Amino acid sequence: MNKQIQTEADELGFFGEYGGQYVPETLMPAIIELKKAYKEAKADPEFQRELEYYLSEYVGRATPLTYAASYTESLGGAKIYLKREDLNHTGAHKINNALGQALLAKRMGKKKLVAETGAGQHGVASATVAALFDMELVVFMGSEDIKRQQLNVFRMELLGAKVVAVEEGQGTLSDAVNKALQYWVSHVDDTHYLLGSALGPDPFPTIVRDFQSVIGKEIKSQILKKEGRLPDAIVACIGGGSNAIGTFYPFIKDDVALYGVEAAGQGEDTDKHALAIGKGSPGVLHGTKMYLIQDEGGQVQLAHSISAGLDYPGIGPEHSYYHDIGRVTFENASDTQAMNALINFTKHEGIIPAIESAHALSYVERLAPTMSKEDIIVVTISGRGDKDMETIRQYMAERGLAND
């Protein structure tokens, strides 16, 4: 295994050629302030203790690493373990990062938060920590996403957040990020931008990765306890890439195959997909250089996925770098493949995963049978499927897949 891999951003915020700080001059003071504050917090044992206290007492960590006996048997290959991020408070991995950044904002003396959300999971996690720490929160959410995720909008409002509909562009996550960045520029004195994925200008990709790395660190100690060795393969779904980078990061220098599963939407041969790595090319969006779905003229294209949490047109800079050096292998799953995996997995394990997580399971169903019964796969179940019930119900009804 190549030990020369760059695992931290350089002083300009780049991983290889990806990352950086492509932001208006007016935002640089805030970025510099954040970078300095984060560096200090990271080195402060008291900050780490406080973070660990809330992760344990409030979020409910550590989450289990569950052996999926029935699912393993049905696939007839490698042993499959599930990293249960669906069991966190609020039902997904998003809370790990929201909590960490809220503590950081509090430390910086910021009384207000602004966030973007797509599926609403990051919005709910942000609203949750804002309520916990008595902070104001404005959430920008695309008007299309608001229609798809009414329940999460209500949850955010119940928790005390103000949800602002974004009509511009296609009314999805990408447009919400634009609005949140604009808002931050004009409220920078008292507001922290609680970015939800491992992207945006440096130091955000590093901050989000560090707060999500609790996933991979736990996997490592748990699998060593259960199996006495590291897994052969680790699989996670990828939108912007925060659950995946948190899962992969502690294993980057180990001899473990890492698979990120992108959303192929209606198929990689259509223009309705979210394959930033699979069909994209490097470009700049939302303050960072990364792989993007764009046309020849560099216009960012609309990403599509049945899962609102994966339809982002980019993938974070660290993933972009790991792709280029061949450290992480990027696979994909279509809407249909993900939904079929979701239905199959649920029947075997009695766990209803988020549609995002089902993309990872779809690849596990292809990978496991090619491996031996001694091999070990860990797959991150990034969230639970409660938010997706209506989508799943519609999908099954349209295809006559009612329960027999």
From Swiss-Prot:
One Pfam assignment: PALP
Modified-residue entries (N6-(pyridoxal phosphate)lysine), positions: K94
Protein name stated in the entry: Tryptophan synthase beta chain
Involved pathway(s): Amino-acid biosynthesis; L-tryptophan biosynthesis; L-tryptophan from chorismate: step 5/5
Species annotation: Staphylococcus aureus (strain JH9)
Job description of the protein: The beta subunit is responsible for the synthesis of L-tryptophan from indole and L-serine.
Family: Belongs to the TrpB family.
Recorded GO CC terms: cytoplasm
PANTHER family per the UniProt record, alphabetical: TRYPTOPHAN SYNTHASE (PTHR48077:SF3), TRYPTOPHAN SYNTHASE-RELATED (PTHR48077)
MF (Gene Ontology): tryptophan synthase activity
